[in-house]
Amino acid sequence: GGERRLGELDPLSAAEREELIHTRNATDQAFPEQATLPTLFAEQVARTPQRTALLEADGGTLSYAELDAKVQAVADALRAAGVRTDERVALLVARGPHLLPAILGVQRAGGAYVPINPDHPLERVRLLLEDCGARVVLVDERAATLGESLGETRVLHLERLPQSTGDLPAANVAPGDLAYVIYTSGSTGMPKG
């Protein structure tokens, strides 16, 4: 044959191209349409209760069963505080071992979590709380003093929650329920959620 430019040569056969582009990239999985995060998490706990679920920065670990106990304690405290489906619950929690139990606990209780940076000034925190309508705020020890300055808002300290007794009925969480509200800085400088 005649001369061809290097860019015109195909280094792969049709079968190799099919294998690399289509077969190896066929990673999609059917997702159960009626699944919720609390349901999927509970299924994982049931399958692998002793497996490591959370690695902490200090080297500590939590198994799925241990994480589930913390999640249930958060959910029970929120249900006892009157949190219902789609109700917003603010999280004044730093990134770390308390954040995941807080998120999953809010969702298990049927609420929607609203993460708020605990490093924000008090007035900004108050503005976000007012805007999102959260009646309940979860705080970690780092944000405990900030939580004391929130007036009428019910503040629950994650490190002080009692263990779950299992007395409260589970929330009926549905796929269409609100899961979270995220605030952005907004183009005007006012947060938008």
Predicted regions and their residues:
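Carrier-protein-dependent adenylate-forming modules in NRPS/ANL systems
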Residues: G1-R17, R24-G193
